[in-house]
């Protein structure tokens, strides 16, 4: 597939009119319609101001600049005019106030989830092990988290039912308390129970990409999702660095390093929960950092895509369960989770089995995730720029598959356990699956037809099916398979190869559907004297202007 860059004409506009921070306009809650006029420099849609004196009509009598965007509900009502600069100012505020804060929260969540791998090689296993030893207890501790994660994935739909500032604050505080309690566990059964509770607390947070769709357009979502998800490799890198620092001080601190690790990484969540209650907006209209006019701009700018989406029907929520796109992206996430969930938990152990010391393994765990963090941001930016997900996803899945193949066949290739080539292969493996997760989540949300119901159900489906992967992933690297862990690496390689096949098939399917919708619309436009009433549009996705993002 050849990807051509989108036109950058609209992005180069510079406004000469109103200050984007100027707070005029009203908070009317009426919904806006939308329509497109040609492919010129200005977009026109439907919006309105209810008060006659709003904006003083100072721009209505002037010839309109190509730097302005008009929206109006019908010819009898005033046009709501705002500039591209004003729209960008609103988006920048969402980026700073919403996306960055959510990324910080996710970093803390992933930190509390994955630090068990570092704690294990910091003598946690020997302190908690039963008598006689049971080598499966560590895997049980990992599995209990993902079992709870799977059973409580339905909580992702609560983003529509509970105010976000309340929901997030409660979740963050709950998993922070449980994360700290891991540091005082006296046995593996206690730790297993705490990991289950941690999984419940973090399961509800999986709806953040869906929450971000309340604020951003489809074409803007991948980069924002990437900023959010990229906190995962950053958290793992930070956790490894912190574990290295704590472990290196093990001779001068009175508490076991692994206990201190849990306490230090859990406490910030408790502290930040109160901040979350105060600053997280439930929607653009409740964002305290927006002026009244900016709230109106935030509402109106999203109406273009809401109007282009396929109309919702009474069974629209359940219709998402029949959508092949939702199911395919769900299976892609499930396969990717085999690698995504296992490597952060087992990499320190794998590096130790390669012959590195415990201290060196903590340090060597960080670089692959730091590189993943940087490349995730670059990939997401390009994905949004070209409005394309599939080709980038396929490329990264291939890279991850290649890395795992090297690790899987390293013993047959005659490589030493501590070979530099084995360590180098970890980099494309990690970079690849982190990018696949980001792109697949954005792909799922982008391609759910209809309104919030369909998107909510489709996203919840992806989360539930996706969490079947980690239940298997926690058993991929038993100690007896070291130092090469051939079977686990082979499973991950096969999983990422399956992602390539599924993603390629999905791109082809959606491309065919898009072309069919275009043909049908051209045929309807060519029929003279036939007018479709609004109620006749049904749920045919393409008729509302909706197209799958490939």
Indicate where each model-derived feature is located.
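Structural signature of the two symmetry-related core transmembrane helices
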Residues: 166-180, 391-406
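Central mid-sequence intracellular linker of multi-pass
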Residues: 218-232, 252-322, 487, 492-528
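Extracytoplasmic gate region of multi-pass secondary transporters
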Residues: 117, 317-381, 441, 474
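Helix-to-loop junctions at the C-terminal end of transmembrane segments
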Residues: 151-164, 374-388
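Extracellular/periplasmic helix-loop-helix junction of adjacent transmembrane segments
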Residues: 117-151
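Cytosolic juxtamembrane N-terminal segment immediately preceding the first transmembrane helix
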Residues: 1-52, 56-119, 126
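Helix-breaking motifs and short loop linkers at transmembrane-helix boundaries and internal kinks
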Residues: 128-129, 152, 163-164, 184-189, ...
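Conserved MFS/SLC helix-loop-helix module at the cytosolic interface between two early adjacent transmembrane helices
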Residues: 150-189
């Amino acid at each position: 597939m050849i990807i051509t860059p989108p036109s950058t004409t609209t992005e180069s506009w510079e406004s000469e009119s109103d200050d984007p921070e100027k707070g005029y306009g009203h908070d009317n809650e009426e919904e806006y319609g939308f329509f497109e006029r040609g492919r010129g420099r200005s977009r026109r849609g439907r919006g309105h101001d209810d008060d006659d004196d709003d904006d003083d009509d100072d721009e209505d009598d002037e010839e309109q600049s190509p730097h302005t965007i008009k929206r109006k509900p019908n010819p009898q009502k005033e046009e709501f005019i705002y500039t591209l600069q004003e729209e960008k100012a609103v988006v920048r505020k969402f980026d700073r106030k919403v996306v960055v804060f959510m990324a910080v929260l996710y970093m803390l969540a992933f930190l509390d989830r994955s630090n068990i791998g570092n704690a294990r090689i910091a003598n946690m296993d020997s302190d908690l092990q039963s008598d006689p030893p049971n080598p499966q207890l560590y895997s049980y501790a990992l599995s209990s988290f993902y079992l709870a994660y799977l059973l409580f994935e339905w909580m992702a739909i609560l983003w529509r039912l509970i105010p976000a500032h309340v929901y997030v604050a409660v979740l963050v505080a709950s998993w922070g308390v449980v994360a700290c309690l891991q540091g005082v566990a006296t046995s593996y059964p206690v730790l297993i129970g705490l990991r289950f509770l941690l999984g419940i607390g973090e399961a509800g947070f999986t709806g953040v990409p869906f929450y971000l769709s309340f604020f951003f357009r489809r074409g803007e979502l991948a980069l924002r999702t990437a900023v959010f998800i990229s906190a995962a490799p950053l958290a793992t890198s930070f956790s490894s660095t912190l574990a290295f620092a704590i472990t290196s001080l093990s001779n001068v601190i009175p508490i076991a390093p692994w206990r201190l690790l849990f306490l230090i990484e859990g406490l910030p969540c408790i502290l930040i929960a109160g901040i979350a209650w105060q600053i997280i907006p439930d929607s653009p209209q409740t964002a305290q950092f927006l002026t009244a006019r900016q709230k109106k701009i935030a509402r109106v700018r999203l109406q273009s895509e809401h109007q282009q989406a396929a109309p919702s029907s009474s069974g629209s929520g359940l219709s998402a369960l029949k959508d092949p796109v939702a199911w395919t992206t769900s299976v892609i996430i499930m396969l990717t989770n085999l690698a995504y969930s296992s490597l952060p938990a087992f990499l320190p152990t794998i590096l130790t089995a390669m012959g590195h010391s415990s201290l060196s393994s903590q340090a060597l765990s960080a670089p692959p995730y730091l590189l993943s963090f940087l490349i995730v941001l670059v990939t997401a930016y390009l994905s949004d720029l070209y409005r394309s997900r599939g080709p980038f996803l396929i490329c990264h899945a291939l890279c991850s598959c290649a890395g795992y193949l090297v690790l899987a066949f390293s013993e047959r290739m005659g490589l030493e356990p501590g070979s530099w080539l084995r360590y180098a292969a970890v980099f494309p493996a990690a970079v690849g699956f982190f990018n696949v997760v980001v792109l697949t989540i954005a792909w799922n949300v982008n391609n759910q037809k209809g309104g919030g119901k369909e998107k909510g159900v489709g996203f919840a489906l992806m989360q539930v099916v996706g969490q079947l992967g980690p239940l298997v992933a926690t058993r991929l690297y038993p100690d007896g398979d070291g130092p090469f862990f051939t079977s686990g690496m082979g499973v991950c390689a096969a999983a990422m190869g399956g992602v390539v096949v599924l993603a390629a098939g999905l791109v082809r399917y959606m491309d065919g559907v898009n072309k069919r919708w275009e043909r049908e619309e051209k045929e309807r436009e060519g029929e003279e004297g036939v007018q479709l009433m609004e109620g006749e549009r049904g749920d045919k996705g393409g008729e509302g202007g909706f197209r799958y993002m490939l």
